[in-house]
Amino acid sequence: MQIILLDKVANLGSLGDQVNVKPGYARNYLVPQGKAVPATKKNIEFFEARRAELEANLANVLATAEARAEKINALGSVTIASKAGDEGKLFGSVGTRDIADAVTAAGVEVSKSEVRLPNGVLRTIGEHEVNFQVHSDVFAKLNVNIVAEA
């Protein structure tokens, strides 16, 4: 299925690219999320007429994401208290939702889908470096300090 991208999509392309994707991916994800439209003659003409407006909107979103990434980097570190055993292992784990809630409580709005844990959930006490993907092009890093609850 031919589509026109309205936003940058990982592994596909950027604004204005006409790409061929599987129909289910287009129907169930790209079109409902507002990231693409089917490449009909009407949509191609409509896109070309609004191209400057869409590019300005995309630049605005990117600037907002960069500002949020700077705020995350400025935090330095966030402390999360969790129940732990004697050897420093947690009862359970600290996942993306816990980290997103802690960062949001510290003053920077972050959703759990923006938190990247390459080695899986955190299961030990101590300092852990966590990556955030605020936008497809914008990344931030933050130290998460996990301490045992008293």
Swiss-Prot record:
GO terms for cellular component: ribonucleoprotein complex; ribosome. Transmembrane segments: none annotated. PROSITE patterns: RIBOSOMAL_L9. GO terms for molecular function: rRNA binding; structural constituent of ribosome. Keywords: Ribonucleoprotein, Ribosomal protein, RNA-binding, rRNA-binding. It comes from the Bacteria. Pfam families: Ribosomal_L9_C, Ribosomal_L9_N. InterPro entries: Ribosomal_bL9 (IPR000244), Ribosomal_bL9/RNase_H1_N (IPR009027), Ribosomal_bL9_bac/chp (IPR020594), Ribosomal_bL9_C (IPR020069), Ribosomal_bL9_C_sf (IPR036791), Ribosomal_bL9_N (IPR020070), Ribosomal_bL9_N_sf (IPR036935). GO terms for biological process: translation. The keyword rRNA-binding applies. Binds to the 23S rRNA. Belongs to the bacterial ribosomal protein bL9 family. NCBIfam families: L9. This is Large ribosomal subunit protein bL9. It comes from Photorhabdus laumondii subsp. laumondii (strain DSM 15139 / CIP 105565 / TT01). The gene is rplI.
